[in-house]
Each structure stands twice: as structure tokens, then as C-alpha cells.
């Protein structure tokens, strides 16, 4: 390593920094052992040959209406096989879900007692729950019986080629289930990447990524595979994709087009480079870059406003590009290892696995600020809230806009780093050494600490990161930085966090003296003189003005939008 850039993981890079070392799953007071992961739901209109555009209803997918009204399905208790599968003459798509049993409460079915009250079914559910160590209170446990309805027709797997979301209605609520087909041919070809001489692209706390003939192969643990499959199914259905769609890029989101739940392997496609490694910035191509940023912002909006999913790990290392020299042709947002469904959908989601004919529950969302984002790209408001309550949770108020804006604020941190590289007259490498090295060192400090075991040290590390973010922000928006600084200072003062307040002040003042604006002045002036450069800076400024929880209600639909 020749330039000594240290990443937020404490790794030497060329000069690449990977996402921070994920902290091991931690025990939460009152939660099941190892609970951290979560996920859940929203809507879509009735299934036809393809899922149509999404609405704003309260389920991930809307119920499938069936014209076959007189049949009642009896289920094989092992996995709920539909006894009249062969005789059923419903239309191709309508027969995917098994008639009125999907729309009625389980307790209204003639065979409800046999199916849902049987010890075998209860034991099976309890076994699934226990195997995943998911915390469920009694009410949640009781409602899980409705998941039995999702399994009444295994022929769904014959109609899809990739994970796909379907809705299941009970009398009182709707459940969202992603069906995950098992492709034996792909399994045999890709599920042992070490033996096929696949090239290692990356290694992280959640698994490895390999490249084999432009196919990205991700090996992960069970939880990460469940998340990958569930989110892929939600995105595919909410986008209106055809049931047989095998696309892995939808609305600038990179998703798995095949997930082997047996080997915990997900497949997608490879890209030239990630955004952190991209060094060919040229301020003259700002229109190209602004267009790319707009597409990525739209991806964040789709993920939150339509799919009800927070990404929670937006960073340059999770944005992949194809480019030729300084021109970026396409970019995608990827990696859902930290993603969570909006918590108002807790307890309503699962995946149905073809390979073992079983259900896998999707863990619930906790929305803990300390579990969100790479500390080096965490939104100002999230770091500020950690200083008040290290293990505090984000209150989205059941408002998708608030969740969306939180992700967009992290996206703003990414764009800020790009602008500093773009405008530094010394070049990208020097910009990384000068503007990013200290930020990464401070972020490393937070990454290495467990907030439950060392809450005060973790809080102080996040406080220093927050101060450094404001320092870097002041390089571009020096007229606004005083207002932002004072707003954060007053927030800590009013909450009685005097130690954090003083550390924030001292770090900001000290680091401001060490940071020169001179290297970017010429490039920044060039950026301001162009139409798209001015738009970029305006939109970036507006996102950074979201620095309190109240600001998360702002309408940001016009920002980074072509």
C-alpha cells in the first residue's frame, strides 16, 4: 500500500475502503438471542400476467382474486399441498393462490381445526421460530397460523423463475410471502464457487462475493440469504415485473435473480467498479454525474416509498458502476445486509422455500440508529440521536417519507465525498488522502466498538464523526455551516448532553483549522458556473439542511430528480 489511506474498517486500501466490519449480532434486552435483523411489507394491485404499478395501500401486495369459488382446499399438513391441484381449472395466474382459503380467516375454513390447531403444524412453526431464534410475543405467535394459507399451492413455484412476492389475506390482516424457487441447474453450476476457480471480488462479515463469467456469486449466512431473497421478491413484484422475469437490475437496484436457500448462495451480475474506486472524475462531465445521482436517488425513493424498505447502508462501496474513463454509463445501489422493512410491517412477512417445502420467517425491524449505516456516511441526524441515546430507535411515525429522507441523507454524504474528489485540482488520490483519511480514521474508531458493551466510547467516537462531517460540509457550504453547527450544538445542550456538546465543539474547531478549502476553490467555482453543477450543489445543500428528526418530514421529491 503506497498512500496509507485507512478505511473505516481499519484496512489498508488501494485506496478502497469496504463497508465497516459488521458488528456480531448482539443481545438486546428483552429480545431473542442474536436478534438484530428484520423485514416486512406494503402493496401492489391484483395479479395479472404481471404485477401492475404499486399503490399506497397497507400491504406489500394486494390479494389475488380468484374466480374459482366453490372449492375448499384441504392441506397436506407437512407443507399444505392443495389436494385439488390437478383438477383445478383456474386461469394460469389466478390458480397460483388457492381460491377462497386465501381470502377467508383460517378459523372459518371447514378444516381449520385440523390444519391450524394440529400439534404437528404448531410444532413445525415453533421449530422454525426456534431455529432462527426470533423473538415473538404471544400475540405475534398466535397470528402466525395465518401463514399456513400461503402454502396451499406449490404450483406457484412453476410460474416463477426468481423470488417473487405474493399477498395472503386473513380476516384481520394481510401477510406478505416471497416464494423462492430452487433451480437445481444453477445450484450445480454456481453453489461451490471455490471449486470452480471463481475470482474473489470481496470478503465481508456477512460472506464472500465471487465472479464467475460476469455472474456475481454471494455466499452468506442464513439470515442474509433470507433478506436477499425477500427484498429481491418485493422489488421484483412492486416494479411490475413479469412473473418469469429473471432481471437482476430493477429501477437501478441490484437484486438477486436466483437464491439457493440450501447453500445460502445468491446470484446477480458484476460491474466494472464500485463508486469508491472510481477515480476519473472530471468537473466538465457534471451533467453525466448529476444524472447518475438522480437515478440513484430515485432508487432510494422506490425502495422506501413503494417497497417500504430502508437500505440503511448507502455508501460509495455499495454503489456499482460501469464506465469508460470519466463517463459513467450506469450505476446501481446494492447490498441489503443492513436493510430493514419499515417497522409497521413487523410480523407479517416470510419466505416460502421450494427446496425444503418450508417457511422461513423474516426477522422484525428494530430501527436502532447504532445498527444503521457505515459511520463514515451516517446521516447527521442519526449520529446526533446516538449522542442522546446510543441504542435509541428511529421513529418513522409510520410515514414512508421520513424513512426515505433518512436514506437520502446518507446518500447526501456519498455525493459530498464525490464532489470533493471531483473539484480537487490535485486529483482524486490527493483528495482521498486529504479529505477522507481523517474521516475514515474516526469512523474506524466507531466501527471497532460495540455500542452495548462500550456505550460511552461509542458515543464519543460518533460525536467526532459528526463534527468531521460538519467540517467537510463547510468546505462546500460555508455560509450554511455556522447555522448547522449551532443547531447541532444547541440540540446537545438542550438535551443535557454537555460532555458530547463540548467534544463536538472541540473536534469541530480543531479539525476546521486543519482543513483547507483552497484545493477545491477553482473546481467548485467551475461547478457553480454550470447549470447541472448548480443543481447538484442546490440539491445537496437541501439534503444537508435535514439535520433534525423534525426535518425528516420535508418534501424532497424535487431533489436529485431530472
Swiss-Prot record:
Its EC number is 2.7.1.-. ATP binds at residues 201-209, 218. One of its GO terms (molecular function) is protein kinase activity. Residues 1-32 are annotated as: Disordered. Keywords: ATP-binding, Early protein, Kinase, Nucleotide-binding, Transferase. Residues 1-16 have a biased composition (Polar residues). Coiled coil: none annotated. Pfam families: UL97. The keyword Oxidoreductase does not apply. It is an enzyme of class 2 (transferase). Belongs to the protein kinase superfamily. Tyr protein kinase family. HCMV ganciclovir subfamily. This is Probable ganciclovir kinase. It comes from Human herpesvirus 6A (strain Uganda-1102) (HHV-6 variant A).
Amino acid at each position: 500500500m503506497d498512500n496509507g489511506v485507512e478505511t473505516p474498517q481499519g484496512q489498508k486500501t488501494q485506496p478502497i475502503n469496504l463497508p465497516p466490519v459488521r458488528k456480531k449480532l448482539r443481545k438486546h434486552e428483552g429480545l431473542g438471542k442474536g436478534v438484530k435483523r428484520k423485514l416486512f411489507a406494503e402493496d401492489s394491485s391484483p395479479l395479472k400476467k404481471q404485477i401492475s404499478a404499486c399503490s399506497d395501500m397497507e400491504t406489500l401486495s394486494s390479494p389475488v382474486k380468484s374466480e374459482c369459488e366453490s372449492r375448499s382446499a384441504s392441506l397436506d399438513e407437512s407443507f399444505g399441498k392443495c389436494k385439488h391441484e390437478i383438477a383445478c381449472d383456474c386461469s394460469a395466474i389466478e390458480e397460483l393462490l388457492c381460491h377462497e382459503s386465501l381470502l377467508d380467516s383460517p378459523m372459518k375454513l371447514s378444516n381449520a381445526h385440523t390444519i391450524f390447531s394440529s400439534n404437528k403444524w404448531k410444532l413445525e412453526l415453533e421449530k422454525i421460530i426456534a431455529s432462527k431464534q426470533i423473538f415473538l410475543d404471544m400475540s405475534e405467535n398466535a397470528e402466525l397460523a395465518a401463514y399456513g394459507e400461503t402454502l396451499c399451492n406449490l404450483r406457484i413455484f412453476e410460474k416463477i423463475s426468481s423470488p417473487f412476492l405474493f399477498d395472503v389475506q386473513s380476516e384481520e390482516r394481510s401477510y406478505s410471502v416471497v416464494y423462492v424457487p430452487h433451480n437445481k441447474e444453477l445450484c450445480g453450476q454456481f453453489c461451490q464457487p471455490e471449486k470452480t476457480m471463481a475470482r474473489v471480488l470481496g470478503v465481508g462479515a456477512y460472506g464472500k462475493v465471487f465472479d464467475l463469467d460476469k455472474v456475481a456469486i454471494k455466499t452468506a449466512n442464513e439470515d442474509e440469504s433470507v433478506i436477499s431473497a425477500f427484498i429481491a421478491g418485493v422489488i421484483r413484484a412492486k416494479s411490475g415485473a413479469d412473473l418469469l422475469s429473471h432481471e437482476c437490475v430493477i429501477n437501478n437496484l441490484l437484486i438477486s435473480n436466483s437464491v439457493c436457500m440450501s447453500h445460502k448462495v445468491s446470484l446477480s451480475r458484476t460491474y466494472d467498479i464500485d463508486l469508491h474506486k472510481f477515480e476519473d472524475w472530471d468537473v466538465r462531465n457534471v451533467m453525466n454525474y448529476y444524472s447518475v445521482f438522480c437515478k440513484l436517488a430515485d432508487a432510494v425513493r422506490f425502495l422506501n416509498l413503494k417497497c417500504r424498505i430502508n437500505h440503511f447502508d448507502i455508501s460509495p462501496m455499495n454503489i456499482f458502476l460501469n464506465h469508460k474513463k470519466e463517463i459513467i454509463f450506469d450505476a446501481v445501489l446494492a447490498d441489503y445486509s443492513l436493510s430493514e422493512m419499515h417497522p409497521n410491517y413487523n410480523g407479517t412477512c416470510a419466505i416460502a422455500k421450494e427446496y425444503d417445502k418450508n417457511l422461513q420467517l423474516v426477522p422484525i425491524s428494530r430501527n436502532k440508529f447504532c445498527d444503521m449505516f457505515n459511520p463514515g456516511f451516517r446521516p447527521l441526524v442519526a449520529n446526533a440521536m446516538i449522542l442522546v441515546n446510543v441504542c435509541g430507535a428511529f421513529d418513522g411515525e409510520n410515514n414512508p417519507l421520513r424513512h426515505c429522507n433518512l436514506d437520502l441523507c446518507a446518500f447526501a454524504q456519498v455525493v459530498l465525498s464525490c464532489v470533493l474528489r471531483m473539484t480537487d485540482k490535485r486529483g482524486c488520490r490527493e483528495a482521498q488522502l486529504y479529505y477522507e483519511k481523517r474521516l475514515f480514521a474516526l469512523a474506524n474508531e466507531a466501527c471497532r466498538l460495540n455500542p452495548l458493551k462500550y456505550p460511552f466510547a461509542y458515543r464519543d467516537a460518533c460525536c467526532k464523526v459528526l463534527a468531521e462531517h460538519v467540517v467537510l460540509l463547510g468546505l462546500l457550504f460555508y455560509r450554511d455551516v455556522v447555522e448547522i453547527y449551532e443547531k447541532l450544538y444547541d440540540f446537545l445542550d438542550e438535551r443535557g448532553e454537555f460532555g458530547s456538546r463540548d467534544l463536538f465543539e472541540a473536534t469541530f474547531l480543531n479539525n476546521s483549522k486543519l482543513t483547507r478549502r483552497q484545493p477545491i476553490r477553482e473546481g467548485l467555482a467551475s461547478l457553480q458556473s454550470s447549470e447541472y453543477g448548480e443543481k447538484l450543489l442546490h440539491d445537496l445543500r437541501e439534503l444537508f439542511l435535514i439535520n433534525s428528526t423534525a426535518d425528516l418530514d420535508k418534501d424532497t421529491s424535487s431533489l436529485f430528480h431530472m
